[in-house]
Amino acid sequence: MVDGKSAIARCADVAKFQSLAAIDVPGTRAIVNPGGTNERFAKAHFKQAQLIAYPDNVTIFDQIIKGKADIMVTDGSETLWQSKLHPELCPINPGKPLQFAEKAFMLPRGDVPFKEFVDTWMHQLKATGEYDQIVDHWLK
């Protein structure tokens, strides 16, 4: 699955945050969960925006809804999922991520038959359109 970092904000604020440059301005409060790729991305790209470290991944999006933060940058797939859970939040350009990443299955090293099985299974899912149906069901 092709993915990458994308932003999520209150739906009313989406127009303000269409690019990294638009996010990284004084006065923007970007919330991050400490210790992962989201924090690394924010620290690398946001020099003027205020970074707010928030340790609870379960309620971090509620902080945006409550107005305690303006935006979060996370995986594009997560912005789609969270916007389904929280209709007040909207993903910002998840189809055009701020950087490129791919999702993968972790498989046992050296288990070639199992890897070939998974590769065939994924190929069939994509060829039949079932993969897109699954993504649409869960993320769109």
Where are the regions a protein language model picked out?
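Flexible hinge/capping segments at coil-to-helix
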Residues: 10-29
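Short, well-ordered beta-strand segments
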Residues: 29-32, 72, 106
